[in-house]
Design a protein with these regions (language model features):
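Phosphate/NTP-binding elements of NTP-utilizing enzymes
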Residues: 2-222
């Protein structure tokens, strides 16, 4: 079933919540309140959980996203339970009537050197290539360009490491040797242009942008 009414242990949200409740995982006050709210909302059917949407995001990220630096590079990204629970909330919690995602904005606060840029890059990559739909626009915004570059460059590095991308690119190159016509498969390849990443087939782009600290805070708070 796509929509799961009961909360089973196959649900990463519930797994994480149970570990918070039994004390095997320690979290801050607001994380505890958040997952209590989510679980209560599911139990009372205030919104629904779409297991397929949640699992699609998790599976795609673990298959197509990679460590791009350090000793784990270039290995596949293996999500921890809290990351799976977060992604399940983002993509799997849906409105009862429309079936659309319930949450349009997510604020994630993670301490330095705990992989927040890596996770953000993986989520951005999934939205850019899969979930965003036709004409998707993904913006990496920071007070300084070098900060905005981090997720943007991570995403491009992940794309280049993806065996599916490599195979498709090789296939396009081989086909071009035998024809002067347009190669259809080339339209589905991610292109790195001067100012963005671009997928012709879906007219999707990923860009980086600079905003002042004040504008960033305004966009978060409002």
């Amino acid at each position: 079933m796509d929509v799961i009414g009961d909360l089973s242990m196959d649900n990463y949200i519930f797994q994480y919540y149970q570990k918070i409740q039994d004390g095997s995982i320690s979290v801050g006050k607001w994380i505890g309140l958040l997952f209590s709210y989510i679980v209560k909302g599911l139990e009372e059917k205030e919104f629904t959980f779409n297991q397929k949407k949640a699992n699609n995001a998790i599976s795609w990220i673990e298959e197509h996203c990679f460590h791009v630096e350090g000793v784990l590079a270039p290995g596949n990204l293996k999500l921890e339970l809290w990351q799976k629970a977060l992604i399940s909330v983002m993509f799997g919690i849906c409105d009862n009537d429309t079936g659309n995602r319930r949450f349009r904005e997510v604020v994630l606060v993670v301490a330095r050197k705990n992989g927040k840029s890596l996770l953000a890059s993986a989520i951005a990559n999934y939205i850019f290539q899969v979930d965003g739909g036709f004409g998707c626009r993904v913006y990496n915004v920071a007070p300084k360009l070098e900060q905005a570059d981090i997720i943007y460059n991570n995403t491009w590095a992940m794309i280049q490491l993806d065996p599916e991308y490599i195979q498709k690119k090789e296939s396009v190159s081989e086909e071009r040797k035998h024809t002067h016509n347009k190669v259809d498969a080339d339209e589905t390849l991610v292109k790195k242009r001067m100012s963005d990443l671009f997928i012709p087939a879906t007219n999707s782009t990923m860009k980086k942008s600079v905003q002042t600290q004040k504008n960033l805070m305004d966009s978060i708070l409002h």
